[in-house]
């Protein structure tokens, strides 16, 4: 159902109010800091760049208190009309994508998001002239926000001709790979992602004999490379394909990071059903903190546990796994680490994870494997290739 024309006009007023709020004195320091970060060392930004900057700053940038400008605006305006509040609440979940224009009628587009493979009916509050150059079969880099049962163009848009199709598909494939949550907006892609991860975990267990394996530093790169080739063989077999005669072997994964580990360090590979495969340095020392025979972990073990807790790249899943498998030991380890005798994981564990890993701890679990459609898969270049 098309959005009410009054709602379309009201959305323009609300965007103006948000822009004025973003430029207000309480946000001046953070606005200046973000402007310097975005444009320091560059020539003066053009109009399109500034439009895009402010749209992203309002809808996506996290302020020091963890809120977006939009969320702070909603909190600071409790008397805002409920109709307006409903519109703005929808804008908390913008979609950034690469779109193919399928249809154009007046100020309305029907577009296909190449990243999530979903179609959207999109309006503009700037009049038909704003979409005049967005012809069918052209491509659009844009941000859209919900507006009733439709979507609204937000910020600046970049238009690409049909002749740029290969480059646009390549960019869309890279976005889906590096920002998988955008691809998983599609329920079918999400379902397929979980299926692929379950299958891949089965291959991991078949290859290593368990969902958890500890490797010595010197053998880690070789074993990871062997597993990568094993995955490819299994995937080809599952697809009913046979390796071509005299075919070149797959390019090995980049395992150069192994050389950066200290001598004697162990590497843990843990393939969690929900969290996917995690790679952990000094994993034997970490594991010994929870499984060792003594009543207390050693200082070296506590040091590694603390590093896991404070390191952003370490998933909360490994701590939840320890708590499930070794509940009493987990309580003891964190009582010792935090110097809090009353700490229990059941009562305090999730709060601890949110303190140190809030974004990951609160995130909805998503598959680590992203199934790409035929067009994107054809144009995808894996990292390091």
Description of each model-found segment:
Residues 262-385:
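Extended, amphipathic alpha-helical scaffolds
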Residues 125-143:
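Short nucleic-acid-contacting surface segments enriched for D/E, G, S/T with interspersed K/R
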Residues 107-111:
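Short aromatic-glycine-enriched beta-strand elements
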Residues 118-126:
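A short macromolecule-binding patch
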Residues 1-82:
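A structured, charge-rich N-terminal accessory region that forms the first stable segment of a protein
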Residues 139-141, 146-319:
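Mixed-charge (acidic/basic) macromolecular-recognition segments
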